[in-house]
């Protein structure tokens, strides 16, 4: 529940339609049928008409709409359009979010550049963790980490050295750094 992370915001105390995924990603799933009658009846569905839901963004920080990168102040509700292929997702300002390529299975494009998306507004840190992905060798120390640090006052991202190793590890990891803004693309 949101109140665990935003106890000072009384609007989150009884809010049970949203949740945080990790410390940075606010998810507001569509819980009621919007494109069907909800009873399984065979009805004509008009996918061209966008529906919307109200999403509360907790106070104490700013938020970015994941799909548009629009920056929004917290402490208020916003109406978010919910076409059939969009779930309302918001990212807390001061977050670093890794985004991998679209794949059909986990190791399909393991050497593709990894997008590191910066959501400015506060200083941020993030540790990228990688391992073999298909066994328990990480319990024996077979994994690697790379630390990222965003300094918001200077708009500087520092990327640390890789620590550790594992079988099949890429010799060279390529990053595409993206500063979230309405000009930098969406989702």
Place the predicted regions along the sequence by residue.
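Catalytic core of carbohydrate-active enzymes
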Residues: 1-156, 165-186
């Amino acid at each position: 529940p949101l109140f665990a992370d935003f106890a000072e915001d009384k609007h989150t105390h009884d809010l049970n339609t949203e949740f945080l995924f990790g410390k940075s990603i606010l998810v507001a799933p569509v819980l009621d049928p919007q494109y069907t009658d909800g009873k399984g009846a065979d009805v004509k569905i008009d996918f061209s008409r966008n529906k919307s839901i109200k999403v509360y963004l907790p106070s104490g920080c700013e938020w970015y709409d994941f799909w548009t990168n629009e920056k929004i102040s917290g402490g208020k509700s916003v109406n978010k359009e919910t076409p059939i292929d969009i779930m309302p997702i918001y990212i807390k300002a001061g977050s670093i979010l890794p985004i991998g390529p679209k794949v059909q299975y986990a190791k399909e494009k393991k050497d593709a550049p990894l997008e590191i998306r910066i959501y400015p507004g506060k200083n941020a840190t993030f540790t990228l963790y990688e391992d073999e992905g298909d066994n328990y060798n990480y319990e024996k120390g077979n994994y690697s980490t790379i630390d990222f640090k965003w300094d918001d006052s200077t708009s500087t991202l520092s990327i640390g050295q890789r620590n550790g190793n594992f079988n099949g590890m890429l010799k060279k990891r390529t990053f595409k750094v993206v500063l979230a803004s309405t000009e930098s693309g969406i989702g």
